């Protein structure tokens, strides 16, 4: 979904990861090729299944989700990637084993964003910006989050510990919270949506934010537009992407 959003926004995209040599893996490769998203760093592995998510809806609202998956064990990419060839690297950690081993080694001038799931210190120490939701921030910081101040304290702890530039905390109906060095804190007000379907909202935030921050270097502007884009997406059923026309309407 991140790759589809980036491509829809006009970015040239290359995917890296591991999927199964199966029906759904072949389907994924076909979809990505159709969208002109490079798959040269996607490994199709025998005896591994491609993750499949089945969502159960009732009255246009998601009630549950069934995941068919297998966790990779100590996977590393077969082909070395020169990350400096890319303007931006986004790491989407779904905790399926892709990042269980330390193989990602960016150079000091790379722009890297992590959408985290669990605490992986080797990843946190390799990135500039992370985009956790409240539950993920609580896990990463090992702190209970029950107020704005507790959220800020947890984020500031991670900023110092891993030398991060910024943390964008996605808070659903409460909007975004941008936290940076030197006690920088900025609240991004929510855009209320009636009966939202939050599927893919985090993917939209990281995609739109990354695209804009890469071109403007304006953290607040980029986060504000990303927040508006997420509101548009959650107003629809299931996953959807934003495109350049959508982006213009948010500016």
Which role fits each region the language model picked out?
Residues 2-88, 105, 241-251:
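Conserved N-terminal subdomain of the carbohydrate kinase-like
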Residues 66, 140-141, 179, 233, ...:
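Residues that scaffold the ATP/ADP-binding catalytic core of kinase and kinase-like folds
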Residues 96-185:
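Conserved phosphate/ATP/ADP-binding segment of small-molecule kinases
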Residues 86-98:
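Short acidic, glycine-rich surface-loop motifs adjacent to enzyme active sites
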Residues 66, 187-188:
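Hydrophobic residues at beta-strand termini and immediately following loops
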Residues 6, 89, 129-133:
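Residue-level signal for inorganic ion chemistry
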Residues 161, 165, 191-250:
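Conserved post-catalytic alpha-helical subdomain immediately downstream of the catalytic base
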């Amino acid at each position: 979904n991140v790759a589809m959003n980036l491509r829809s926004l006009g970015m040239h995209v290359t995917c890296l990861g591991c999927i199964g040599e199966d029906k759904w893996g072949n389907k994924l490769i076909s979809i990505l090729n159709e969208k002109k998203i490079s798959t040269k760093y996607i490994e199709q592995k025998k005896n591994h299944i491609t993750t499949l998510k089945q969502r159960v809806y009732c009255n246009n609202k998601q009630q549950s989700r069934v995941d068919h998956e297998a966790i990779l064990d100590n996977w590393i990419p077969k082909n070395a990637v020169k990350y400096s060839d890319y303007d931006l690297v986004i790491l989407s950690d779904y905790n399926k084993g892709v990042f269980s081993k330390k193989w990602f080694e960016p150079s000091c001038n790379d722009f890297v964003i992590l959408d985290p799931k669990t605490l992986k210190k080797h990843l946190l120490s390799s990135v500039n910006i992370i985009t956790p939701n409240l539950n993920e921030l609580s896990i990463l910081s090992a702190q209970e989050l029950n107020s704005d101040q507790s959220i800020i304290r947890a984020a500031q702890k991670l900023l110092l510990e891993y030398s991060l530039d910024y943390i964008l905390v996605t808070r659903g109906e409460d909007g975004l919270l941008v936290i940076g060095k030197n006690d920088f804190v900025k609240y991004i007000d929510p855009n209320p949506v009636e009966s939202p379907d939050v599927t893919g909202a985090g993917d939209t935030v990281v995609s739109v934010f990354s695209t804009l921050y890469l071109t403007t270097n304006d953290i607040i502007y980029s986060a504000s537009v990303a927040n508006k884009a997420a509101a548009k997406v959650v107003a629809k059923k299931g996953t959807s992407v934003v495109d350049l026309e959508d982006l213009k309407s948010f500016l």
